[in-house]
């Protein structure tokens, strides 16, 4: 199809969505309190997608991959995100050409893990992916990433060299959430720093 859709402004207010696959335990739910997209373009013929900005405010998303009760801590079979807020500008996608400026991202997960900030740029061309400075913060941890990844290094027969600088300060509280169920004496003995 060679359709071109111009999306001047899309606003969602208080939209709920639920999906359960027949004969499967997969369940998805979402509640979008507010979401908006401005100056969007979907060009199906050129396979090009772009938007000036995309925002989500105070929304909730959940994924359950089975009927079992969630494990203590971070359980990838049961993800529940609340208080999701994000603001992304300069969005562009066409093949290997990608651009996004993440201005804001905040979310809380069922396990207690909180992302208090995620900001930075992600861009790529036909040669490589660039992450010039991505910052991830929780109330207890901070991670900074700078990376250059040639597309050729992701192929079946990799070529080229990835370059990445990762600086991280991980808080005890976040590590214990990620680890899940641990003996209390181990938790007490684990150093704070």
Predicted feature residues:
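N-terminal targeting/secretion presequences
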Residues: 1-193
């Amino acid at each position: 199809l060679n359709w071109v859709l111009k999306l001047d402004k899309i606003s969602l207010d208080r939209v709920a969505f639920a999906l359960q696959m027949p004969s499967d335990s997969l369940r998805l739910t979402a509640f979008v309190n507010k979401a908006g997209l401005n100056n969007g373009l979907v060009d199906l013929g050129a396979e090009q997608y772009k938007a000036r900005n995309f925002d989500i405010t105070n929304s909730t998303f959940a994924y359950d991959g089975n009927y079992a009760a969630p494990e203590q801590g971070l359980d990838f079979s049961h993800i529940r995100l609340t208080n999701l807020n994000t603001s992304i500008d300069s969005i562009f996608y066409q093949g290997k050409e990608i651009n996004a400026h993440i201005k804001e991202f905040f979310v809380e997960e069922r396990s207690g893990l909180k992302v208090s900030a995620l900001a930075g740029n992600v861009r790529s061309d036909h040669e490589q992916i660039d992450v010039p400075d991505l910052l991830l913060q929780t109330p207890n941890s901070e991670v900074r990433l700078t990376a250059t990844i040639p597309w050729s290094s992701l192929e079946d027969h990799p070529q080229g060299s990835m370059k990445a600088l990762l600086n991280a300060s991980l808080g005890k509280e976040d590590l214990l959430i990620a680890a899940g169920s641990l003996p209390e004496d181990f938790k007490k003995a684990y150093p704070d720093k």
